[in-house]
Structure formats: C-alpha cells, structure tokens
C-alpha cells in the first residue's frame, strides 16, 4: 500500500472501485483526520486524509480491498463546555461503515473522558469498520408496492420470530435466512399479512448497565452502526448482507413488503459517561443537540439526541435511508421516537430532514411510518407529521382497549377511532392509511397479556418493576395470570376476538404484533427489551391454532370490504358507512355520548359489524334484508338471519347481506 492520494469527497464512507478504496469522513470542527488501517495481526498503520472539501475529509488508498479493517483518529479541540470532545487517542468507527468487526463492550478504554480527556489508547478493544463490496445479483426483484388501503403490517423480531420454529432447519432458526425460508413465506401468505416490519436490524450494542447485569439489549434500539446489519443473526458476519437480501428477495416474490424499524434519534454513545466510539469523537457539536453547558439534550431518554436539523447530519440520515432502499431493496421504514426528526429544536413540519425526504425521489415513494413522539417538551406530535408519513395511532390502541375491556369510553369516541381518527389525520391531504392502527407492539403487553394481567410484571428486567408503563388499559377478567376456570378463559377469548376484529376491520392501516395471533404471552412483562430468551421467542409448538385461523379469516374478510381497502375518507351518504343502534336506527346524539356500548356498523352497504360491548346478552335488530354471518364468525354454510342477532356479552359478529 502507498500513501493516500487525495481521492474524492463523494460517495461517503469507504468505497471500493476495483483498484483501491476511497475514504471520506464528515467533520465540521476537526483540525486533522487520520485513517487507521489494521492487518490480520492487529498492527496499525496511520495515514492523514489529505483532501478536504467543505466539511468532508477524504483520501484514496490504492491497493486496498474489501475485508480491510479500519477506523479514524480525529484531532481537534477538547472544549467540553462548547461541545467539542476530540480525542485522537480513541479509534473511531466510520458512521458509514457497512460492516463492523467486534462488539461494543463495557470496557474502560472505550470512554473518551468526562471533564478531561482519557489518554489511554483503545485500539485493542475498539470495534473496527470493515470495507465491503456491495455487489449482489437481485435477478428480477421488484418491489410489491402494496397500496396503503390493502396493507396489513406484521411487526416482528428477526430472532424471536423463528428461533423456536420446529419446521425450520436448526442452523437457520433466528436468522435473516429464516425470514425468507419457504416455511415462513407460506405462513405469512396463509395469515394474509402484506408487510413484514422488522425491529432494528442495523448493528446495535447492549448498554454497559445491561452488560454488568448479565443481560443484553434484545430489541435493538441502541444503534452502533446505522449502515451495517446486526451480525448475530447471520451464519457469519461477512454473510449478513447477502443473507438479508436473499430474504428480501424471497419475500418480494411472494408479494410481501419489508419495512425496517430504524433509530435515527440517538446513538449507543449514550450520555457523557457512555462510550466514545464514533460520532462523539468525530464531531460531537454537529452530530448531537448540545445544551448551553456542553451536555446533551436528552429528548430520547437514552442520554443523547441526534441533531437532525444540521445539514451534515440530515445528509447522513438520508444517505442511510437510501442505502437500505437501494442496496437492500427495503420497502419502507418505521421511525423510532420520530419527533426528533422534526426538531429544530422545536418540532416543525417543514424541518430540514422532512423536507429532504420529501424532495428525494427514492425516499418519498416508500412507506414511511412515524412513532410520533419523543420524551422532550413538545414531543407528542400525533397527527402532525407531514405527508408522506403515516403514524402509529395510540388513540386507536387506547380506545380499542378501553371500549372492550372494562374502561369508560363513549360510543362516539370508539367510532371516531374506528374511522381512522379523522379528527387527527384528515389534514394536509393525508388519507386514512396515515393512521397505523395497533392494539399492541413490541413495547407493552402482548394481546394475551392484555386480558390476563392488570399489573406489569417486569421484575426480570432488573429494575425492581419500575420500568415499563403503568397505563396499560388491560383487564385480567378476575384473576391475575394466565390460568383460570373455564368461564374466565372463555371471556378472555371473547375479548381477544373482539379486539382483533376491531383492529382488522377498522379504517386505517392495521399493524399486528407477531405472536398475538398465537396467543403468545410475556407473562406480564410489558418492557421486555432485555429478554433474549423464551419469554420473548415465539413458541410455535404451543401456538393457539384456532386463534391463528381466526386472525387469518379476519384479514381475508378485510380485503373484501371496499370501504376499508379504498383508502378514502368516509363521507355522509357516500355508501361507505352507516352507524346504527341496536334497533338498526341511526345513533342519536345521546347514544353517541351516553348510550350503552351497543352499535352496528354497516360498511359498503353489504357488511354489517354488530357490536355488544356490554356485560349482558342483548338482542340486536339487524337492518332490513337477509344477513348471513361470515367467517370467522360462522362456517360457510351458516343459515341466514333475517331479523335479530342475540349478541353475547363482549360479543361481535360480522354479517354479509344476501
């Protein structure tokens, strides 16, 4: 290898051209940048990056090839009060690294210093960036581009979804490969979901606190390298990218989209006592929101917050998203704590990152889903994200639980949430699909636990049950825990059926948590982020097959109802919806606000949802005509009902006009 040539300022990261590697690094405040390369024995050689265009440092290393391990040492001021924490003794990861060798361990050498710099070299223990080649044969792969009106999302964890699946080869369980295996593809198709939304797959780290407790970060919301796949779910680290792309290709062939949960709000460097392994040492002042005293704004609850209004960081975020779309063919993103994306530092719909995404021909055409809050002041922004974003709708989640489980909720509030929360999302030209309706998600109780536990049981997390929300809107139906007498178990089953029907037959985009269709329980743990064990892994051998069949039938039914698949707002008299009382008459103003939880929802003038959310059996008079209950509420040969449905307590039934 020779000394570095000046190279080019783009593309960002380490790019192999067949003859050598071009390296670039953004740092607005650095005074000097050293590229450090390592041989197979760990010997280090350093080169100054000779070029600088604007805030991008660059150089070209002739003869370098894929597999080369490298990092950076960045020189600049140590001025903590001004937000500058340069420390060239610390080897740093390339923020654009496509592969990383080594884990982020709880090691004293990885700390850059608090008030004074830590002068101990960390190269022996620091993770290393690795040069890769992105070549891959996509064959005839094409994005499914499922319309929002027909989209049904399935949220899953790469490992937890398949680790215990008995029909998969042992060696691929819990891996990217398993996602595209014919057994899983067939299951997704039988269930009827159209999009697989994966918890974070970008390489992440376990927080030092968890490592000291013998736990790991299971969910993955602690990002370490945003362009690199988490290697633990591949047959070998160097195969992660191809195995993930193989899975995407197989899912696309089956018409299933792949959506990634992505964490663009903070990094695994955490607070000032956390490790310094990348952004803090590269350009702390640019990458993070810094307070006047030099500490971090902690709007994420994770110690730091990425400054996504800084031009260099906006470019970093957009290039990251484009990488996943262009290199891995993913179909969209769910953004964790997405209010951070709009902070300037107050939330703005025209924030720089939103504007950049909207202007990008690649990103503006994929599915974009916001978790529309963070923990900072003004962080709750449900309904306020600009097009083309959809948003998780916590109003729907809470209303569905409060309606069917013993909580106070009016019929009017329930109907509003059933109709895609038009009071929240019908603005800025957005369609009903902007409301991503959910009952449960990775964060919180599973659906089964919603009907079995009144209180969270998070003792296994090591925080004395202090972590996790206390606002669960759950109901154990009379006994805390999974067991109980037959009549109690039947009431729980009825509640689960009613909740699933509400989710899958309401307007908006439904999201189903993987395992809810099995009856999966986390035994009351509503914050299982650190439980990489049987508590979170889906037990396919214990799955409730009847509940899976029920869920699949609901999804098939949904796809038959034009009022749900059309993705247009319901208007008075358009034939999409009529709201009726138990006597098949329009609901009165008093019934909307004060009436019993009894109603009928007529969709597309052909499908009738009869609802009895009271504690008593109640006769419900159906509208004129011949009505037949449809699967999953009856068999195909179910007799016609012409007048009255005897609605059981906490009961729901769907009829089709003859």
Curated annotation (Swiss-Prot):
Pathway this chain belongs to: Glycan degradation; glycogen degradation
| Residues of the site described as Transition state stabilizer | 443
Report the active site residues.
336 (nucleophile), 371 (proton donor)
SUPFAM superfamilies xref list: (Trans)glycosidases, E set domains
Q: Does the keyword Hydrolase apply?
A: yes
Q: Which family does it belong to?
A: Belongs to the glycosyl hydrolase 13 family.
- NCBIfam families named in the record: glgX_debranch, PRK03705.1
Listed PANTHER family: GLYCOGEN DEBRANCHING ENZYME
Please report the name of this protein according to its UniProt entry. Answer: Glycogen debranching enzyme
Species the sequence originates in: Salmonella enteritidis PT4 (strain P125109)
This protein's encoding gene: glgX
